[in-house]
Each structure stands twice: as C-alpha cells, then as structure tokens.
Amino acid sequence: MAKTLGLHILADLYGVDADKIDRVEDIRELLEGAVKYANLTKISSHYYQFQPHGATGVVLLAESHISIHTWPEHGLATVDVYTCGDPSKAYRAMDYIITQLNPKRIDKQVHERGIVEEESNQSEAEKLRSILLQV
C-alpha cells in the first residue's frame, strides 16, 4: 500500500492590496502568524526587502517550509506551503495566508510528494490470505 510523505500547496494570489505585501515587516508577521495558526514547528526564517517594491520570506520548518515572494506593483503574491506529517497543517497555514491577504483571485495547486510503498510486517502468506478474503 502506498502512502504520501508530504503535501505541497502552491498558490498564486492576484489582486492583493499592495500595502499588505510591500513591506518585509508585514511579510514576516504574515508567515510567523501562519506557522502559529497551523501549529507548525519553526526552525529558522529569513526575509528580504526588495527595492523599490516587494519582499520575500521563507520559514524553515521541522515539517518542511513556507515561502512567499511578492510583487506589490502587480498585486501578486506567490506562496508555497510544504509539510510532511499531518496534511491539515498545510491547509491551515495556506488558509491563514489567503484570509489575511484577501486576494481577488487564487490559482492553487496541491501536490502529494514522496509517494512510497508502506512497509508491512505481514508475511507473504498473510498478505495472500487477506487478498483472498476480500474476493
């Protein structure tokens, strides 16, 4: 049986108020708020203010990462939320960011990452028996 190790949500947020995404201080507050809201585990973070407009930020998580890059002159923010473990935390973090930025349009993709075969402690005979019982 296969299982997914991570969930990666990517969103392009259009029509965002430029004042919400121009200053690195606001981007820091946004991402740190998303980490707390989703109950994620922050390891470190880095933020950068572009001139004349925009900011970028990344939060390294024990569960993976959250990042944002902004173009306030276009009302655009691109956001990545990637987590392993509980997928609901990725959705909570992204929902928090979207709610705070209140975009007019959202283009979102969700990708399951690291799909692997789950190890089983069953012997081959037990596996065959369970398959035959399903028939």
From Swiss-Prot:
Pathway entry: Amine and polyamine biosynthesis; S-adenosylmethioninamine biosynthesis; S-adenosylmethioninamine from S-adenosyl-L-methionine: step 1/1
Record text on cofactor binding: Binds 1 pyruvoyl group covalently per subunit.
CC terms in the record's Gene Ontology section: cytosol
Reaction(s) catalysed (UniProt annotation): S-adenosyl-L-methionine + H(+) = S-adenosyl 3-(methylsulfanyl)propylamine + CO2
List of catalytic residues: 64, 69, 84
Cofactor(s) annotated in UniProt: pyruvate
Family: Belongs to the prokaryotic AdoMetDC family. Type 1 subfamily.
Protein's name according to its UniProt entry: S-adenosylmethionine decarboxylase proenzyme
Species the sequence originates in: Aquifex aeolicus (strain VF5)
Gene: speH
